[in-house]
A protein has these predicted regions:
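Active-site mouth loops of central-metabolism enzymes
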Residues: 58-66, 112-120, 238
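C-terminal segment of N-terminal export signals and the immediately downstream linker at the start
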Residues: 26-58
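Alpha-helix-loop-beta-strand connector modules within alpha/beta enzyme cores
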Residues: 98-111, 163
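Glycine-rich, proline-tolerant flexible connector loops at the mouths of alpha/beta enzymes
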Residues: 81-100
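N-terminal secretory signal peptides and thylakoid transit peptides that target proteins
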Residues: 1-19
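Structured C-terminal cap/extension of enzyme domains
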Residues: 21, 211-389
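Glycine/proline-rich, positively charged
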Residues: 117-226, 230
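Conserved, mostly hydrophobic/aromatic
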Residues: 48, 60, 82, 97, ...
């Protein structure tokens, strides 16, 4: 354990400069001389929909984390719900979770994901996840990356997930979505099948999504909020503003949210997040979020899906704009490389670069041309750094 060498006030000042969802380059140097907080936050538990699981309102998104010490610190703080996926870090993320919680499995809830394939491939994926996680069951198995209401009501989804439950490989099941969230939640609410929905949800989203979250929660679906920090931009890029705890508290005000899974990468970040459970949203927090929203305007795609179908070449703009968030917000270009393996990013960015005039208009005022130009720069740079297998 790190020694307690500094006071609480200075500690808070230091950690407020760290980014939620992206690793600070000098954080390892800081950690060597930084004392951990002796205080354990007052935990808030909420029920994860009809699963009945009592989860900490602030839980942990593990996607960008590569340090098992962060997981163990979260566990020490009392956080009990962890979100990972088969594809994160090409499986290494699940392996880290499994190793960190070996011997503690009964004290944590693990949510992981499976991608749509034929049953044989999906079954193989689940089996790999079980091995990596060092467990014989998954608490919540999520069908990853839905983007249309039809996918939410897919009979193949129902059949496969039902088999996983019957075989004891998954206790509960659900889906995740980054786009068209409101329409997907409304569709899911019509069915009694889904136990959990993992949804991109933060202070930038519309009243329509908030209402859909309420409808889904009323139907018994446990709502897990991701992307709660709206990209997690670093303090230095926002003129010293560090609104990430305020963004988290804003989401926790919505009692229809069972838990939030902010993406953290450092011990300092998870401590800052956990502290959000014991402090109320203030007027000062509101002012911070207003400044943050002003900073984000024209920078971040909310994945609302409003521009789908507008491109004459059929290029999905959200896939390209997510690249900007990976680089500029998360500061994790490894995610760009992973995205290139799963999508046609290179082909699509080439189409964009050859297009004489972009006809796509963002309803939220995003400068589409400028963002696509940035995405092109980051994609090309990542493609050049990939070493052929």
């Amino acid at each position: 354990m790190l020694s307690n060498t500094i006071g609480r006030r200075r500690f808070i000042k230091i950690i407020s400069s760290t980014l939620l969802g992206a690793a600070a380059p000098n954080i390892l140097k800081v950690r060597s001389s930084l004392g951990r907080s002796e205080k354990t936050p007052t935990l808030e538990y909420r029920t994860l929909g009809k699963t009945g699981l009592k989860v900490t309102a602030v839980s942990m998104g593990v996607m960008n984390c590569s340090d098992p010490a962060v997981l163990l610190r979260a566990f020490d703080l009392g956080i009990n719900f962890y979100d990972t996926a088969d594809c994160y870090m090409k499986g290494r993320n699940e392996e880290m979770v499994g190793k960190a919680f070996e011997g503690k499995r009964q004290k944590v809830f693990i949510q992981t994901k499976v991608h749509a394939h034929d049953e044989k491939k999906m079954r193989a994926s689940v089996e790999r996840s079980l091995r990596r996680l060092r467990t014989d069951y998954i608490d919540v198995l999520v069908w990853h990356g839905h983007s249309s209401p039809e996918e939410v009501s897919d009979p193949n989804l129902f059949e496969f997930m039902s088999k996983m439950k019957k075989e004891g490989k998954a206790r509960f099941t659900g889906f995740s979505t980054h786009s068209h969230m409101a329409s997907l939640l409304r569709e899911a609410a019509k069915s009694s099948f889904h136990d959990v929905a993992l949804v991109s949800y933060n202070f930038t989203h519309s009243k329509d999504l908030k209402e859909a979250v309420a409808l889904a929660a009323k139907s018994g679906i446990g709502i897990v909020a991701m992307k709660t920090q709206a990209g997690g931009y670093k303090k230095e890029k926002m003129g010293g503003l560090s609104p990430h705890q305020a963004a988290l508290k804003y989401i926790l005000m919505d009692q229809n949210v069972s838990c939030a899974v902010p993406g953290v990468t450092t011990i300092e970040q998870i401590e800052e997040c956990a502290a959000a459970m014991e402090v109320s949203f203030s007027k000062g927090n509101l002012n911070e979020l207003k400044q943050y929203q002003s900073f984000l305007r024209g920078r971040i795609c909310t994945m609302c899906g409003g521009c789908i179908g507008e491109c004459a070449y059929g290029v999905p703009r959200s896939d390209l704009l997510r690249v900007v968030m990976y680089h500029d917000g998360y500061q994790n270009d490894g995610l760009i490389g992973e995205a290139m393996e799963k999508t046609e990013l290179l082909q699509n960015i080439k189409l964009c670069s050859e297009c004489p005039s972009c006809s796509v208009v963002c309803r939220r005022g995003l400068d589409m041309k400028a963002q696509i130009k940035l995405a092109q720069e980051f994609i090309v740079r990542s493609s050049e750094s990939i070493v052929p297998g």
